[in-house]
């Protein structure tokens, strides 16, 4: 008989199967066992098959095997325990609890209590979980006891006490990657990211050393082409998946989305169907392609429901919908999952999302809701600021740390509300109203990078506050001057425009040279660099808006390599369309006079865009937008614009000849 290219001779099945199990080649063992007809009716065969299925995390199949064993040998209570454990791991908590209550073997009492406590914990019934743990008679395993206590304290948001239990567990039982991860998670929730990263580094270092077969980092080295390692027991035992996901969460929280992606890329290579829910959730949030795949992944997880679905999924799906301005979709999700609203959304998060959705139909009502939120959190911030000042003069440094942490948490809640209040007038092009909202929130937020960035955008859009806008943009650029491409292209473009509008052309040129040199150094190793392209597009658009179409359009053509390069896409074409349409409007009204050579250059540019943009979509679609119609292309739109310009030239020539 052949199995995985290996011939098994008669009489050597037992030896071969046990060798596979010893070497943790469980899938091969399953394939061999399933090829033996007697396995499904014998105790030995079902026991081996159930064990292998359990180790490969196919808990449904494992539970089926142990269910047969319970009926086949009812006098062996261990099989009933394994059956209940398999059901629990499969997320079938009610069935697992029902089976566990029928177990009355004294020698298994502590294990049954442990399982029942885990079921209660999974059902978020923490008081029952604690009472069951207290009934255990065997307290010799101090590390396990401390870890369980830490988990219950963590769920009660008592992170400092939970951390102490985890540290005690590590001291009592030696290093355990799962307990070390729990300790790192406590530091993460306490905003102590450096300590959390220390634990993560140790988990990863030991995982790489002890399990080189997992191929940590192989995806990055092969650009995603590494062979999947699946979900072997070694991966579950190593804690690597949890560690890398926590590292990704830390990077994401600190605003380093690229670093978050890299952390997920360092995970042992697996196919998407093999990914655990937490990894799939985090990949959805950091998807570099766009929001579509991320939204679909989160929606898929939400449909799986608890306990498989991470509790953060519901809120993040709604926030991602709002980020992509899919407010109707967010409203539908809220309406379809009302049972999750009170379970997974805090009152603050619900009120914020409700205000964002309401703003689409009744902005005034949304402003009132956001105003109530802002006043409540603002009052709390003032009282916490006073508390921090009191603690600064007291000798208790721990009280000061707690007060500062509370203030930072409240500020994190206040900032999105302040941004949302400014966003409502921004959407209506009421930039003066948006500035007024920023001034109202300056008391608390003026030192936060997010507030300063968006305040700069508002001042820039005012059209007469370029100097003040530059004062906000400059620190952002200076902070990343050695890595200028880490700065958003829109920030660089707006700063250049602000310099030009305040007669600081030399500063604008120096900044553009800096960006150009950085792009030349980077080359094409990490994909297309569009920073300088976007800067030139924005500057060209500015000159067109001021009526200087000759220089503005030449700048735009230069930015897009004359329309023949890879920079031609829906994003960049939008700038071209606007400026050419502005030119056509001015020519038709005879408010613009353009030299013949400039018109010929524009026609040549549009002809090139037509040739190279034949298959490139010209419009940006939403992440979940699907239409049966063929989207318009840049080539088609360029041809129409060129035809309009030619017709205007013919008309103007006719008028000139008539006169």
UniProtKB/Swiss-Prot annotation:
Compartment(s) of residence: Cell projection, Cilium
Domain of life: Eukaryota
Keyword Repeat carried by entry: yes
GO CC annotation terms, alphabetical: axonemal microtubule; cilium; intraciliary transport particle B
Main localization of the protein described in the UniProt heading: other
Keywords recorded for this protein, A-Z: Cell projection, Cilium, Cilium biogenesis/degradation, Repeat, TPR repeat
Renumbered ranges of TPR repeats: 3-36, 43-76, 143-176, 178-210, 391-424, 450-483, 533-566
Pfam family, one: TPR_16
One Gene Ontology term from the biological process aspect of the record: protein polyglutamylation
GO MF, one annotated term: intraciliary transport particle B binding
InterPro entries linked to this entry: TPR-like_helical_dom_sf, TPR_rpt, TT30
Keyword Zinc: no
Function: Required for polyglutamylation of axonemal tubulin in sensory cilia. Plays a role in anterograde intraflagellar transport (IFT), the process by which cilia precursors are transported from the base of the cilium to the site of their incorporation at the tip.
Sequence similarity: Belongs to the TTC30/dfy-1/fleer family.
PANTHER family referenced in this protein's UniProt entry, alphabetically: TETRATRICOPEPTIDE REPEAT PROTEIN 30
Protein name in UniProt: Tetratricopeptide repeat protein 30 homolog
Species this chain originates from: Aedes aegypti (Yellowfever mosquito)
Classification lineage: Eukaryota, Metazoa, Ecdysozoa, Arthropoda, Hexapoda
